[in-house]
Amino acid sequence: MAPVAAPSTSQPAGGKPMNWADEFDEPVVGDAPRIEERDEGNGVKVVIEYRTNPDGKKIKITRRVKRTLVKTKVNHEVAERKTWTKFGQEKGKAAGPHSATTTIGENVVLKMSAGNKTAEPEVDDMDKMRQQLANKRIVCRLCKGDHFTTKCPYKDTLEAIPGAGADTPEGGDGSMTPLAGMDPTNPAVAASAGGKYVPPSMRGGAKGPGEKMGGLGGMSRDDLPTLRVTNLSEDADDDDLRELFMRFGRVVRVYVGRDRETGICKGYAFVSFENREDADRARQKVDGRGYDNLILSCQWSLPRGERP
């Protein structure tokens, strides 16, 4: 078997062997792009670029760039923090956040209200009127029924009676009973039938002029067992005192002395009970008790004639 001869390699005239990669032709690189710049003023710069496209044609690209200086006002403390030297993993890094150690979130706008109080929405006048009409019940002036007076089924009968329905207007609360005080033997009713004026003392079955309007069970305001509470705070109101004293017995009346101009409590109040034993027990428990960071004083209220 004949030996296989080694492939022959061509050598240049200098005697140095040639690499096989040198046999391929090097790609022809086109002309390098030529760039021209000129300034047109007002911050406008024109950049002209001459280059060769893939088809071998020379093209001209013109760009106009306008530079505008935008000034932004930042907080002095924020600008000062940007000049701090970085430390830790960011030590030696350039200014500004780095994506490897810093995550930038969305900007949250914080709106501070004056006094941390939310402004209550203003209610329209029409809405106020609708609310008032929604809670108002229609009451007939004649029979006190839940219908208009013009549609009353007893209109022909009750209109013949003088004074019927004169006490409660249409749309009132209807708390009075029908035909209250319409006794024909009453002199006030007989006088009103003739179109004469009837004084308040003679209305509603009153016995005569000078009669004092009685309170609970015929008792006047001075006859009720009343306590005088002093050293109250400026924020005290009727509901607070009623809640404080109602645990000792039934509270008939609560009066808090207030300033006429400001409406602030003057520091005293009167509480009337139905039962004197309940009032005495409340006096012993409340007198000297701490309430709203103050020590209350609770004593019996003297009648007007016995006050010093």
From Swiss-Prot:
GO cellular component assignments: eukaryotic 43S preinitiation complex; eukaryotic 48S preinitiation complex; eukaryotic translation initiation factor 3 complex, eIF3e; eukaryotic translation initiation factor 3 complex, eIF3m; multi-eIF complex
Subunit: Component of the eukaryotic translation initiation factor 3 (eIF-3) complex.
Gene Ontology biological process: formation of cytoplasmic translation initiation complex; translation reinitiation; translational termination
Name under which the protein is recorded: Eukaryotic translation initiation factor 3 subunit G
Known function: RNA-binding component of the eukaryotic translation initiation factor 3 (eIF-3) complex, which is involved in protein synthesis of a specialized repertoire of mRNAs and, together with other initiation factors, stimulates binding of mRNA and methionyl-tRNAi to the 40S ribosome. The eIF-3 complex specifically targets and initiates translation of a subset of mRNAs involved in cell proliferation. This subunit can bind 18S rRNA.
Record keyword RNA-binding present: yes
Keywords: Cytoplasm, Initiation factor, Phosphoprotein, Protein biosynthesis, RNA-binding
Gene3D superfamilies: 3.30.70.330
CDD domains with a match to the protein in the record: eIF3G (cd12933), RRM_eIF3G_like (cd12408)
Domain RRM: 225-303
InterPro entries: eIF3_g, eIF3g_N, eIF3G_RRM, Nucleotide-bd_a/b_plait_sf, RBD_domain_sf, RRM_dom
GO molecular function: RNA binding; translation initiation factor activity
Gene name, Swiss-Prot/TrEMBL: TIF35
Keyword field contains Cytoplasm: yes
Region spans: Disordered: 1-23
One Pfam family here: RRM_1
UniProt family annotation: Belongs to the eIF-3 subunit G family.
